[in-house]
Swiss-Prot record:
Organism for this UniProt entry: Salmonella typhimurium (strain LT2 / SGSC1412 / ATCC 700720)
EC nos: 3.4.13.9
Catalysed reactions, semicolon-separated: Xaa-L-Pro dipeptide + H2O = an L-alpha-amino acid + L-proline
InterPro entries named among the record's database cross-references: Creatin/AminoP/Spt16_N, Creatinase/aminopeptidase-like, PepQ_N, Pept_M24, Peptidase_M24B_aminopep-P_CS, X-Pro_dipept-like, X_Pro_dipept
Enzyme class: hydrolase
Protein name: Xaa-Pro dipeptidase
Length: 443
């Protein structure tokens, strides 16, 4: 494999091309991209954890340093002002020298408010991309050039097409997340609490809670029915029945987002359902290819859900087609089949149909689907089907003409297990699909 430095060099070439195109389209001279700033907790002097501007880390793998600035014009070497204060209260990151610094001009910025004296005097035609509009106004950036929608839409649209450098980073993030999942399963099997399982995961991935790309979902038993459960009980339940782990990792700013579900016992109805969801997930991925709408795969999986509901006698005396048509699969899988993945976990532009930002909403029947794009090579997406037993979604079906088709006794027996989700991260290629997760032998 090419070195990361060589891949990064080509990555910058691609970003420079996109920059030239977007500047010409919107008649701008350059983009000033701000890493962001620290924001204090209300009525306190402690800041919230820093989260870098994703458009900034698209260019440079600097994810922990606020008050940095990047000036790009698509022609000259990108110029990075790296915040380097004299500060004995806090850790100060040294001026970077790494695989990427040959491609970027790196200059120390000793004072956060010193950027004004470093920029070109004429700034009326510079676009600001960042989270602090008032800072841009102070720098005499025109209000119309602060996060201009057309520029943002263009940049977001092309972020769907990962460079080889980005794919290499995402494969590294996968390795870290897979290590975490293996450690977490072992912790679950040894009877640990959600809190302690989370610690085992973080230790294995080398992350702290503020480093992971999203809050880990560490859900034992019925907690697996809460789609974004992040509470972390300190006490292990008296009986371990099930474990759903939705947790990722980050490498050079790029995310992994994996989910696995385990049954404490290997021979009960729940364990068999977990195996079948896993098998159907793999079967769907095997059918994926460029040129097909992501929506189609979501709809196809509802047909697979119907097959499982029928096989496991959760829904009875109804055809699979009728289940999907009447949305009886909906309460069992209330979320989308997945989402774009990259610099952000729910990566941008999932609904954009072109680089002008044309929006295609999710089908009204499936409003929580996060992507309606036609799959193309270099796109990275999650495939994360699930089956859950969520009372608030099942309750409306307890009355009415379809109630008789629900095997309520079976559902009540499965509710203490919460639910099931299996999630892999896949890359679309010209001639097939790369499953980054399964390539690392994560069962």
């Amino acid at each position: 494999m090419e070195s990361l430095a060589a891949l990064y060099k080509n990555h910058i070439v691609t970003l420079q091309e996109r920059t030239r195109d977007v500047l010409a389209r919107f008649k701008l001279d350059a983009l000033l991209i701000h890493s962001g700033e620290l924001f204090n907790v209300f009525l306190d002097d402690h800041p919230y954890p820093f989260k870098v501007n994703p458009q900034f880390k698209a260019w440079v793998p600097v994810t922990q340093v606020p008050n940095c600035w990047l000036l790009v014009d698509g022609v000259n070497k990108p110029k990075l002002w790296f915040y380097l204060p004299v500060d004995y209260w806090h850790n100060v990151e040294p001026l970077p020298t790494s695989f990427w610094t040959e491609e970027v001009e790196v200059v120390a910025l000793p004072k956060a408010d010193g950027i004004g004296s470093q920029l070109p005097a004429a700034r009326g035609n510079i676009g600001y991309i960042g989270p602090v509009p008032e800072r841009a106004l102070q720098l005499d950036i025109a209000a119309s050039n602060i996060n201009p929608k057309g520029v943002i839409d263009y940049l977001h649209y092309y972020r769907a097409y990962k460079t080889d450098y980005e794919l290499a980073c995402m494969r590294e993030a996968q390795k870290m997340a897979v290590s975490g999942h293996r450690a977490a399963e072992e912790a679950f099997r040894s009877g640990m609490s959600e809190f302690d399982i989370n610690l085992a995961y973080l230790t294995a991935t080398g992350h702290r809670d503020t480093d992971v790309p999203y809050s880990n979902i560490v859900a034992l038993n019925e907690h697996a029915a809460v789609l974004h459960y992040t509470k972390l009980d300190h006490q292990a339940p008296s009986e371990m029945r099930s474990f759903l782990l939705d947790a990722g990792a980050e490498y050079n700013g790029y995310a992994a987002d994996l989910t696995r579900t385990w049954s404490a016992k290997s021979d009960n109805d729940y364990a068999h359902l977990v195996k079948d969801v896993n098998d159907e997930q793999l079967a769907l991925i095997a059918t994926m290819k460029a040129g097909v709408s992501y929506v189609d795969y979501h709809i196809q999986f509802h047909q697979r859900i119907a097959k499982l509901l029928r096989k496991h006698q959760i829904i009875t005396d109804m055809s699979e087609e009728a289940m999907v048509e009447n949305d009886l699969t909906g309460p069992f899988m209330p979320h989308g089949i997945g989402h774009p993945l990259g610099l952000q976990v729910h990566d941008v532009a999932g609904f954009m149909q072109d680089d002008s930002g044309t929006h295609l909403a999710a089908p009204s029947k499936y409003p929580y689907l996060r992507c309606t794009r036609v799959l193309q090579p270099r796109m990275v997406l999650t495939i994360e089907p699930g089956i859950y037993f969520i009372e608030s979604l099942l309750a409306p079906w307890r009355e009415g003409p379809f109630s008789k088709h629900f095997n309520w006794q079976k559902i009540e027996a499965l509710k203490p297990f919460g639910g099931i989700r299996i999630e892999d991260n896949v890359v679309i290629h010209e001639n097939g699909v790369e499953n980054m997760t399964r390539d690392l032998k994560l069962a």
